[in-house]
């Protein structure tokens, strides 16, 4: 298993301060000991309108020169929207990200079934407004209708992915998806060789050892991508502690080993961050956590992977 850094960590959304450019991200990933990067599919990092083929190939050349892989791109798509124009624009967005991923040499595109979005107020991101809008637009639709729209979006997107030689990695991420069983149900219903799984531990509701191993066995060879997250602190004995607990990750890594997974597990810092003295923490908080996250995961893989 290889360790990656997801660019949402340095997108400038959740901390005070500017984003890192993708060139800076590549250097940061190398400095911290990551094997590769995953590029978030929105500005200022990975909006496909900003990344024509020529520019993608230039970035890939820079990454290759640093020994850093560009292993994935991440879509922030919402295939659940009942608004025709919104739903159709999401198909175009994902299709263009598939093209961009292929031009970057990335093997996977992370996709959602649905996504509420984020807003800036004025700099720090928030989920609350986007969540209210999403919830309101779904008040007159049924769960079955939402599911069907998501399936239709993935069916069309999987065809585009096949054209470009890219694999869509469906994440077990809410809304619509409640747990890994929903993720697997959708993958089986779409029934495309170009749609696989992205099972992530942090967003599993049940993190018991039994459920972690059960989920891994059921996902099996469909697993092509994974993420980890959280905030880290160094204990007095020098060990690194994760805020959701280290033990679930031990079981997750063991479970991934048991199913023969050898792809990437990428770190992401993607949630509202602490407020200190009345201000949200700055980029140094993201840097500290990204550095410790790499050390944390490499240590787990050495011991249990």
Predicted features and spans:
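Histidine-acidic metal/acid-base catalytic patches
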Residues: 1-33, 105, 177-305
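Short loop/turn segments at strand-loop or loop-helix junctions that form parts
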Residues: 8, 75-76, 112-116, 268-270
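A short beta-strand-loop structural module common to alpha/beta enzyme folds
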Residues: 35-44
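Conserved beta-strand positions in the central sheet of alpha/beta enzyme cores
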Residues: 38, 72, 110, 169, ...
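A short gly/proline-enriched turn/hairpin at secondary-structure junctions
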Residues: 42, 171-173, 270
